[in-house]
Amino acid sequence: MREMKDSGLKWIGQIPNGWEVNRIKYLFKTAKGLSVTKDNLIEDGLPVISYGQIHSKINTGVTVADELRRFVSCDYRKYVSSKLEKFDFAFADTSEDYEGCGNCVYKRTDDELYGGYHVVILHSIKKEDNRYFAYLFQTDAWREQIRTKASGVKVFSVTQKIINEASVIIPPVEMQARISNFLDAKCTEIDSLTADIQKQI
């Protein structure tokens, strides 16, 4: 039987020996997205993703679907801190509902993409596969840390500080890969079944 230890976190309780606990701020560097609005959008140019797309129903949170990309002038390319590199995350910093607090996208690829309006970017410090965190960030248990601290009445605000202070549980790298590969395969299987059902309708 696997030996367990207390994580010190209310939302998870015990974790296996060999797993670690850390805060987001020690794993990522935060930055703001571009100060652009709908008025700045054009047909083609520099790809951006803003909070509206992050809250989209087609956003899985674990990759960036092509349909979520919008475009602004290439003049914005000079704002390098707003650029999403491979293994980075983009969180929406506002949400109209409690459930949307913590919504994000994970950038798995090398293609060019910038964070847009109302976006907090997490730049990966180690610059390595963060699929495990992408899946962790989708769980209600993890998001409870964000939701309980988000402020607002009609619109909830999710600040860089709130995200930075959130804790994560970290398995060894090989276990992260096993978890991520398993979930990737399951999600692909579900997507395939969903597509088949839609064809039959």
Residue ranges and their predicted role:
Residues 2-38, 165, 169, 173-177, ...:
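Non-catalytic DNA-recognition/assembly elements of restriction-modification systems
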Residues 4-7, 38, 112-119, 128-131, ...:
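A short glycine-rich beta-alpha junction/loop motif
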Residues 7-8, 25-40, 52-89:
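Sequence-specific dsDNA recognition surfaces
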Residues 50, 75-138, 157-159:
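A short beta-sheet element
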Residues 105-106, 149-152:
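Short amphipathic beta-strand starts and helix->beta connectors
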Residues 142-145:
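Periplasmic-binding protein-like
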